[in-house]
């Protein structure tokens, strides 16, 4: 009887660990679009889902999934987003270390650090990317295309080009205190 109890507890622990790892990531669907492919027999319908995945602690990714049903497309988008994760260096006040720009297709995104208490001032897919990356104080401006996918990719590129103060100091061969 005691062995059965131990087995149940250990399986519960295993299940808890699994759900903890899964719940660490947040997923937000930015867009679901019905797309068609013209084939010999007519038109074939499918769905495209743009999904942003992040842990709100400096990791974020954008994924695209296509399937004949919405749930399958979202599932594929989540898997794709987890494959294309980017690490974002965050400052103590949950902002970014310096201004940055990124391009994705015809979309261009400018992001700038903001003072504590400012919040995320951005729109559309860019806002979702920044929130799921864990950035709490930032200003962003979207230029060019209004496509959610290109804007999300541009925001991801801008975040991936960020460097920490330590990296900059190391590349210049100076102490970190000299940067401030």
From Swiss-Prot:
User: What PANTHER family does this protein's entry cite?
Assistant: MITOCHONDRIAL RIBOSOMAL PROTEIN S5
Domain of life per record: Bacteria
Q: What is this protein called?
A: Small ribosomal subunit protein uS5
Q: Which UniProt keywords apply?
A: Ribonucleoprotein, Ribosomal protein, RNA-binding, rRNA-binding
Xref: HAMAP family: Ribosomal_uS5_B
Family under the similarity heading: Belongs to the universal ribosomal protein uS5 family.
> Which Pfam families does the record match to this protein?
Ribosomal_S5 (PF00333), Ribosomal_S5_C (PF03719)
Q: Which organism is it from?
A: Synechococcus elongatus (strain ATCC 33912 / PCC 7942 / FACHB-805)
The gene it comes from is rpsE
InterPro entries for this protein: Ribosomal_Su5_D2-typ_SF, Ribosomal_uS5, Ribosomal_uS5_bac-type, Ribosomal_uS5_C, Ribosomal_uS5_N, Ribosomal_uS5_N_CS, Ribsml_uS5_D2-typ_fold_subgr
Query: What's the subunit arrangement here?
Result: Part of the 30S ribosomal subunit. Contacts proteins S4 and S8.
Q: Where is the composition biased (Basic and acidic residues)?
A: 17-26
Region ranges (Disordered): 1-26
Source species taxonomy: Bacteria, Bacillati, Cyanobacteriota, Cyanophyceae, Synechococcales
Function per UniProt: With S4 and S12 plays an important role in translational accuracy. Located at the back of the 30S subunit body where it stabilizes the conformation of the head with respect to the body.
Q: Which GO terms describe its biological process?
A: translation
List GO molecular-function terms, semicolon-separated.
Answer: rRNA binding; structural constituent of ribosome
Record's Gene Ontology CC terms? small ribosomal subunit
